[in-house]
Amino acid sequence: MYLMYVDESGDCGIVNSPTRYFVLTGLVMHELRWQVYLNTLLDFRRAVKAKYGLRLRDELHAAAFLSHPGELLNRIPRHDRLAIIREFADTLATMADLSLINIVVDKQGKAADYDVFGLAWRALIQRFENTLSWCNFPGPANPDERGMLFPDHTDDKKLTLLLRQMRHYNPVPNQAAYGTGYRNLVIGKIIEDPNFRDSGHSYFVQAVDLVAFLLYQHLVPSAYMRKKSGQNYFLRLDPILCKVASSQDPRGIVRL
């Protein structure tokens, strides 16, 4: 069984949206690595507590943690908060059997009725399904694996209905070599409805939130991140990027 934790950065709006991009990221691991990697994250958080004073129960929500930490976390200087983010990325990059699937929607030029949320999630679910089918995830593998979704809370109802629909009707355009038209490639490897998680209670959701944030900052860095070269932090995750997710991008980013 492979588990995929999911979070996003940016917003889904098209009209009058303050953001150009919407990023959706999935962090995938095999069930046999779950406890090992949870222990790795706990060790990281204990080290951060000793070094910077960030308590284990404090949520590390990357965007807010860096720019709007609130009264409790504001006691940690901003440059230290950035260092924590960098060290978090470096810790994830050591987890060789993690795999990161990244979807980027460039909303510029899209029609007002373009379904950013639905199409981004459809692309992520399809890549998860495909990679399961081809046994392309690193780490332990059984002959016939399945997968489950563990997203941060989002439009829970819409996502649940989308996944259920894709199990019965999932039109995918034919590759150019096979001519025009579609094939109905229904989802068969992903079981159950999405299991939604509260990021404040899940280190894995906080980890995938960090990845989505760093990819967004790689695309359009804030003034502070640009000043500190933080736009390059996403590249520190290169060892665990799922590069088979897209042959059109050297880092496997699926661009819509």
Regions found by a protein language model. Name each.
Residues 1-256:
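Phosphate-ester processing/binding pockets and catalytic centers
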